[in-house]
């Protein structure tokens, strides 16, 4: 997977290239990062990449030409590696919400070109000509797209085969389909007792089925309390078992649903 980033601050991306899980994956050749500064594609002595907005208003707007030239250079470099043209994604508060599914889709692809905006915004003509999708992390505004781009990259790289030391680690992440799209359960490590708080007995039992049921119950409890819409989604997808539904009924103080495994007795004919 190759990631190209168009940014005024290429040095910010040393974090994902050199450190932690993403840094190790980069060193192993599981993915590559290439940063392109629009200032390198300007033609004036001041390397200007922004100007005042037409129609007035506060702030400055990033100019179309340097951005488009940077994108073309990135796509040409990809072509030189015999890679197909990549989607061009703009980090933007008006974009589609980036989630675990989008991260998995990116991890399964050849990569993309990320555009990190600054100032008041980007010239709309560049967006119309070059951008194929817009991505948002949520309903808030950052000073630039770099922090959002780092999150997009990190979420995808850790899903690459071999990126994590334990291949099953990503399968236990919150939102993963192996957890039925639910939130992850709490985690504990040594010491067994910390500030008078003990590790739950189920985790010390050594009984694998009991541990799995405890983790599933905690996942259901946490998801119901924090993200109830994920419960609805899991139910719609058919990802909840009868045991799950019984746990949820108990948590909500309602009567458990009938067991679908038990056939209803037919009334004798009169």
UniProtKB/Swiss-Prot annotation:
<comment type="subunit">
    <text>Homodimer.</text>
</comment>
<dbReference type="GO" id="GO:0002939">
    <property type="term" value="P:tRNA N1-guanine methylation"/>
</dbReference>
<dbReference type="InterPro" id="IPR023148">
    <property type="entry name" value="tRNA_m1G_MeTrfase_C_sf"/>
</dbReference>
<dbReference type="InterPro" id="IPR016009">
    <property type="entry name" value="tRNA_MeTrfase_TRMD/TRM10"/>
</dbReference>
<dbReference type="GO" id="GO:0005829">
    <property type="term" value="C:cytosol"/>
</dbReference>
<feature type="binding site">
    <location>
        <begin position="137"/>
        <end position="142"/>
    </location>
    <ligand>
        <name>S-adenosyl-L-methionine</name>
    </ligand>
</feature>
<dbReference type="GO" id="GO:0052906">
    <property type="term" value="F:tRNA (guanine(37)-N1)-methyltransferase activity"/>
</dbReference>
<feature type="binding site">
    <location>
        <position position="117"/>
    </location>
    <ligand>
        <name>S-adenosyl-L-methionine</name>
    </ligand>
</feature>
<keyword id="KW-0819">tRNA processing</keyword>
<dbReference type="Pfam" id="PF01746">
    <property type="entry name" value="tRNA_m1G_MT"/>
</dbReference>
<dbReference type="InterPro" id="IPR002649">
    <property type="entry name" value="tRNA_m1G_MeTrfase_TrmD"/>
</dbReference>
<protein>
    <recommendedName>
        <fullName>tRNA (guanine-N(1)-)-methyltransferase</fullName>
        <ecNumber>2.1.1.228</ecNumber>
    </recommendedName>
</protein>
<comment type="similarity">
    <text>Belongs to the RNA methyltransferase TrmD family.</text>
</comment>
<dbReference type="InterPro" id="IPR029026">
    <property type="entry name" value="tRNA_m1G_MTases_N"/>
</dbReference>
<dbReference type="InterPro" id="IPR029028">
    <property type="entry name" value="Alpha/beta_knot_MTases"/>
</dbReference>
<keyword id="KW-0808">Transferase</keyword>
<comment type="function">
    <text>Specifically methylates guanosine-37 in various tRNAs.</text>
</comment>
<keyword id="KW-0489">Methyltransferase</keyword>
<keyword id="KW-0949">S-adenosyl-L-methionine</keyword>
<keyword id="KW-0963">Cytoplasm</keyword>
